[in-house]
């Protein structure tokens, strides 16, 4: 599993990291925009000029889904996108899409997983 954040995080990856902590063997990724803003290191970047990933589940949060980003995650078996914009490209490419504010939704998912004891 890879949980990534983009411009929609507004630089706050706390919720992204908390969700990743609740799912065993999960990595944190980011969009190029987040790297360019200085919010994440280049090593976290998913995309054409970053990492090519192929997890069972990819959870992009606040990522628009630019073509360059989609090149990096096209090997994902399932994409569960969380974005406030239902028309964002990532939402059209996702297997599952949640139209919501990641700052509310991602912590709620992490809290629910924690309550169910999913963390290792």
State each model region's role.
Residues 1-120:
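N-terminal glycine-rich FAD/FM-binding segment characteristic of electron-transfer flavoproteins
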């Amino acid at each position: 599993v890879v949980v990534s954040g983009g411009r929609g995080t507004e630089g706050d990856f706390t919720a992204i990291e908390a969700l990743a902590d609740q799912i065993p063997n999960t990595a944190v990724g980011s969009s190029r925009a987040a790297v360019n803003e200085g919010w994440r290191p280049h090593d976290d970047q998913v995309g054409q000029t970053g990492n090519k990933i192929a997890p069972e589940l990819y959870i992009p949060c606040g990522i628009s889904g630019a073509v360059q980003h989609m090149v990096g995650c096209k090997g994902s078996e399932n994409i569960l996108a969380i974005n406030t914009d239902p028309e964002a490209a990532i939402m059209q490419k996702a297997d599952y899409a949640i139209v919501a504010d990641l700052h509310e939704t991602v912590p709620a998912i992490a809290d629910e997983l924690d309550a169910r004891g999913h963390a290792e």
